[in-house]
Amino acid sequence: MKFTALLAGAAVALTAGFASAETRITYKSAKSTSSYYQMAVQIAEAMKEGSGGDIIVTVEESQGSVQNVMEARARGGDYVFTTPPVLVRLAQGGKAMFEGKGDPKFDEIRALFPIPSLTMHFVMGADSGVNDFADLEGKTVLIGKGSFGAREGAKYLGLFGLEGKVTLADVELSNAVPALKNGQIDGFVTAGSFPAPNVIEAAASTGVKVLSLSDEQIKQTKRAKLVIPAGTYAGQTEDITTTSLPVVAFTTTAMSDEAAYQLTKTYWEQKDAMGAAAAWWNGVDSDLMQHITGKIHPGAAKYYKEIGWALTDAQM
């Protein structure tokens, strides 16, 4: 009887030990059809694999980054979400889409790690005769509707003196490749982590030229400079210089230091394996840390200090 009781006690202790070791995370991502949702699923799988099952991530669909930030007001210590850092700054300042929606909880948002950036692609048909932005005049271009890429594409046309000089095709971005194939458009604009699936398809099926931006044009956009290496797309013999909007995984101060440490450590240790399965992870490296302009969670900061990565005063 005593032996049975001891076994039962040991079983309870073991169960308690496993329960305390397991970290459950809710990861708020993007629309289920987006590349960022695919990334979230890949992160969930990598966390489970890298932690031996101790980190369990549940991916939640989202309508976008603004929703992700807004939900930080009410979520607990298990909440991780993705957004460009600029939206966190706007939320904390009660500006733009967050005007009149300020909340002290926004000041508790903390960064964990960068994920692949939103990368601008101006994709032109190989036979369109377009080699730079000046050549876009008189052409028909699809920029889509309502997305970051559509807003950014329209903004760039205005900045570069092309507003009203380019015909904007009334076609959904999902139909960009067929429209390019049948000559309905001369090119399209898309924003997504490289290599972008629709650009891969277009490059392989019809041949394309992805336009580069000059340093002066990049300065005009007020976005980060990003280089897409030669060979990323079929027929691409030179680097493409373009712009990007950094995207970061955030949590809040409600998350424990240990959970933030383990999440960050496992993410970076699994990044190469993720990159072997999906090339967009290969563009993530320590250089992206400079785009985290706000505070980093103390648990994540502990990991970065361990591996010798310098953090700025603003990040601490």
What are these regions (language model features)?
Residues 175, 181-182, 192-201, 205, ...:
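An extracytoplasmic/periplasmic, membrane-proximal ligand-sensing/linker region
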Residues 38-73, 235-237:
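Extracytoplasmic small-molecule ligand-binding "clamshell" domains
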Residues 79-116:
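Acidic, polar ligand-binding/catalytic clefts
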Residues 84-85, 93-96, 101-102, 164-254:
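Pocket-lining segment of extracytoplasmic ligand-binding domains
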Residues 1-7:
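Bacterial N-terminal signal peptides that target proteins for export
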Residues 115-130, 224-228, 245-259:
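A bilobed periplasmic-binding-protein/Venus flytrap-type ligand-binding module shared by bacterial periplasmic
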Residues 24-50, 55-56, 114-182, 286, ...:
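Bilobed "Venus flytrap"/periplasmic-binding protein-like clamshell domains
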Residues 15-21:
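Sec/Tat signal peptide C-region and signal peptidase I cleavage site
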